[in-house]
Amino acid sequence: MFQGAAALSLDAKGRLTVPSRHREALQATSLPAASSLVLTAHPDGCLLLYPAKAWEPIRARVMAFPALDARFSVWKRLLVGFAEEVEIDAAWRVLISPELRKFASLEKPVMLVGQGSHFEIWNQDTWEKQLRQLTAQTQLPPGMEDFAL
């Protein structure tokens, strides 16, 4: 399970180094191909990073969307159209393509945010803006009325 947020820096080639605290979990969820990941775009403006095994059922569901329904087409274009298989190198770095970096406005400072089965990768400024908006909300979304910490 991937959880927690980490402020990271992309190198000059657009590579992101996976923090050591996530490496063991990544290996456990990705076996036998621990180095095989999928990067794709999310409509909120971030990137999604999935172990290939976790991505496959999502890709299959998206591909089953009705082809001629415009409401589904945008999701297919983003999730499948931007999807790229990436490998983790020996130094635990993931290369983010120029197209995906442009989509998410990624610069050197980025945020890697664990989401259980996958990670989100955010432009640091966009992430901070999202957090401010979230903490300014006073109402819980439907279904969370009984949620307590």
Task: Kindly give the residue locations of the regions a language model identified.
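Residue-level signal for well-ordered alpha-helical positions
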Residues: A28-S30, R61, E107, Q133-L134
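A positional/architectural concept
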Residues: Q3-G45
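Short, charged/polar, Gly/Pro-enriched secondary-structure boundary elements
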Residues: A25-L26, P57-I58, W127-L131
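Helix-adjacent hinge/juxtasegments
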Residues: L47-E85
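Beta-rich strand-turn-strand
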Residues: E84-R93, P98-E107
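A short beta-strand-loop micro-motif that forms or neighbors metal/cofactor-
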Residues: T29-G45, S105-W122, T126, Q139
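Short, structured motif recognition centered on aromatic/hydrophobic residues
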Residues: G14-V18, Y50, W92-I96, L100, ...
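Short, Lys/Arg-rich amphipathic alpha-helical interaction segments
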Residues: D125-L149
